[in-house]
Amino acid sequence: MTEAAQPVPPAAPAVNPKVAAANEMLKKKMATATLVSKEVFAGGRLGVFKLKPDTTDRWWYQAGQYTTLGLDTPTGFVPRAYSIAGSPLDDGIIEFYIALVEGGALTPTIFAQEPGATFRYLSPKGKFTLATAGKKTLVMVATGTGLAPFVAQIRSLWKLHQAGVPSAYRIILFHGAAYSDEFGYAAELEGYAAARTQGFDFTYLKTSSRPDAARGWVPAIAKGRVNEVVRTVLGQPIPAGRSVEMPPGVTAESIRELIVPADTAFMACGNPGMIEDLKEPIAHLGVSTYLVEEFWKA
């Protein structure tokens, strides 16, 4: 009887010596934070990581910004930029929504960490913010973990709303994922959407490009790629042979009626193909503000 061959784990990516030296220099400039919470789901492919900075100083940022995280890995110190998923109002906790990339330079090490582990980070950066968008109606489009900056923004508005500060925004969020067990933060976002009767103007639409009941798909989740769902909502064509199916009780027209082009900004984060594909229909709608954010290194 012979044993079945065991799969060979992906080889760690080669590191350029100059890059490695630069990374070590950067490491010395980075502050430290402790991992206080780790929640992994979707078969271990997605995770929410919460860090608490070791400094006693208040770590302030604008919702929608990103920071650089770094860890020592088998090939040396590796830094990568990640959008912050937590709200600046989250009591000093920095939260991240991260996808595991097999064979990636950093994410396998991130997912191997447990509470108590030390991460390094830099000060926040970026202009992917509500202030930059500068419009009352915000159409947010995300694929996968590109949802992170939108969670930060929507959660911040909700916390202010709960504190008696009414939101000046109407937000429409489209979140696309391949499978329905990959919708991070769904329960939280559905709770906000249910609060429309309380004056919180938020619409949330999930869409699965590979709808499979065994992976959590239910009719309340739209079918189709998120960029094609947005195209359908905007009354623009999608490629021949492709299809979009809206959830029961939701029509493209009912969502389109919420969008006033003159006072609307689109914001997209995630797959570069999705971001590129939306340029034409957004321009056709007459919307001039289109903010994008892309991070694809692993």
Model-derived segments and their meaning:
Residues 2-9, 13, 20, 26-31, ...:
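Reductase modules of NAD(P)H-dependent flavoproteins
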Residues 67, 119-122:
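Generic structural signal for buried aliphatic residues
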Residues 84, 151-162:
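Histidine-anchored nucleotide/phosphate-binding helix
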Residues 124-134:
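A short, basic/flexible loop-to-alpha-helix module at the beginning of a structural domain
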Residues 137-139, 170-172, 265:
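Structural motif
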Residues 140-143, 268-269:
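Active-site-adjacent beta-strand anchor residues
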Residues 143-149:
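Ser/Thr-glycine-rich phosphate-binding loops at phosphate-binding pockets of nucleotides
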